[in-house]
């Protein structure tokens, strides 16, 4: 069936009118109670407590990503994302994953974009303090565990992910 322009325009206009008429004109206020504070080292912490669930999402977002990298010198944010999952001085190789499994955590992962790098996982509520300690350990005590062999291996992993579009 071929529609003429006037009929199409009329039908299209009616659909737009009805869509606007059906939309709610009153907005529902949505708010989430949270605490926000800044640590002595400049780290901003946003804390929200939800007692309706037995698990807690632990998510860290760092304002660093590929947009801050120079042409010809890219991939560093993603490389650091990988390195931070490997080892720390206090937890050892694979220690973060082992600790997470021991306390019932799941979904540990990370992601890097143009303007941020995220690390996240879910843990039982009673394990939150342990996981925050483990995340702090990961951020503060991984660098001395990185040697040339580890660095080269992770560079290849990141390059491979880039080739695959991951």
Predicted regions and their residues:
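Bacterial N-terminal signal peptides that target proteins for export
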Residues: 1-11
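Acidic/proline-rich low-complexity IDRs
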Residues: 2, 15-17, 38
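Bacterial N-terminal signal peptides
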Residues: 9-19
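His/Glu-rich zincin catalytic helix
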Residues: 22-98, 120-123, 129-136
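Acidic/histidine-enriched segments that form metal/cofactor-coordinating
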Residues: 29, 62, 88-89, 95-166
């Amino acid at each position: 069936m071929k529609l003429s322009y006037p009929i199409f325009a009329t039908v299209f206009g009616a659909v737009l009118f009805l869509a606007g008429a059906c939309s709610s004109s009153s907005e529902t206020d949505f708010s989430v109670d949270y605490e926000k504070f800044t640590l002595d080292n400049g780290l901003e912490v946003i804390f929200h407590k939800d007692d309706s669930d037995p698990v807690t999402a632990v998510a860290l977002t760092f304002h660093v990503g590929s947009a801050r990298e120079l042409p010809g010198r890219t991939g560093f944010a993603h490389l650091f994302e990988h390195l931070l999952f490997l080892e720390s001085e206090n937890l050892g190789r694979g220690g973060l994953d082992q600790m997470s499994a021991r306390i019932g955590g799941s979904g540990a992962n990370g992601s890097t974009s143009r303007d941020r790098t995220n690390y996240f996982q879910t843990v039982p509520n009673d394990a939150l303090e342990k996981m925050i300690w483990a995340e702090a350990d990961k951020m503060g005590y991984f660098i001395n565990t990185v040697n040339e062999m580890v660095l080269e291996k992770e560079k290849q992993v990141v390059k491979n992910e880039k080739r695959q579009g991951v």
